[in-house]
Amino acid sequence: GATVADAAARPLHWIYDQKTLQKHIKGKKDFAFLKDNKSPFYSIKTGKVSGYNDVGQVMFHSLKEDQNEKDILSVFKKNIVKNFGPGSLYWKNLTLRKKYKKIKWRTKIKGPWIHQNIMETIQNIKKKKSITGGIKVNESDGYCAALPYFLYGYNFNSLKKIISIVTVSKISLKYALAKFHLIDLALKGAKDP
């Protein structure tokens, strides 16, 4: 469900100005899976997912590869570098993005957008740091990464380790854990989680 929702909303990704957003959806009964990308930063084919969902997909594939709870941390780190690091389309677009930052931003990057937390994570993994998560931004990457792990039924207490692979921002950690507590309550049948 989360993957479909991400893909459906992705053409409107990162449009923060409400007037601009209203302009893009005006007169539309349904604005899921918009044909034309409206994201101001990057453009990918409609139906493709954002980097937030992609990091969750990387965890999902890591779990398929190795379900041993002790090994999943190293498998996940390896797969983050493989999916987002040097040689990937994400990394190629990061190089283009750095070029655009030096001059006036004129156009969207064609292809996926790598997030700050993922860039920091890759750098920290390559430096063999024990703490790999990004610290510069408060985003949902850690939550998205840990969602498949949580849904597989792993220990609730070990979620922080998974989230921290991608972010160690205190705000990101708190929000992610709060979301997991709400999901946990809902899964257990709480009337009003």
Label each PLM-derived region with a short phrase:
Residues 1-193:
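Structured, active/binding-site neighborhoods that engage oxygen-rich ligands
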